[in-house]
């Protein structure tokens, strides 16, 4: 009798302590949640769509995780070992098994349909009026090639830059990506762009900047001992600043190409 009273009192104390802890921690957890889910700044047109899918998945899995853990703790407490209590066994509940099989399947189908729309925007709706840039990754740098005044690639007036990608704000950019040596991963976190650069294969991706600024280009694939230093920079310019930068690059390249000839004539 005494042990039963003590057990009941301990149960009440534990429930009260857990309730108090939950009430105290709930505001802190709710306040911290946005920081846990915080992603890099959005600077491309489709970044909000990508983040929307990510946040939806995080909320769904987060709620399911909390519910499952609470049920688990409840069962651990309710069916804990007690003196004189005989364990009972059950085959299961077919109705519950059907529910928790169908419900996750429906959630997966919903997420697949929503993700399909975002995937179509990024991978299948390549803009026609876009700036074309060729990108080649190598250990351990990014090489960018712009068409020159003739508007064609692989001609003498092509503009080449190392680890520097520029384009105007509000204009779509189509990148043709490949690699010179090993697999690299072209990663622009703020643009929500991440695509492998594979030797012998050309992959096309696109994005459009929504604000002027300067961000880092990372390689997100371990590509050798110098992987840590393989980074470049992407600069989104105003249209006027972009044209000025492009003209400066063309002039510098032309001057550099002419320098050996001038030296030879002298």
What is each model feature region?
Residues 15-18, 57, 70, 100:
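Small-residue packing motifs within transmembrane alpha-helices
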Residues 54-79:
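Alpha-helical transmembrane segments
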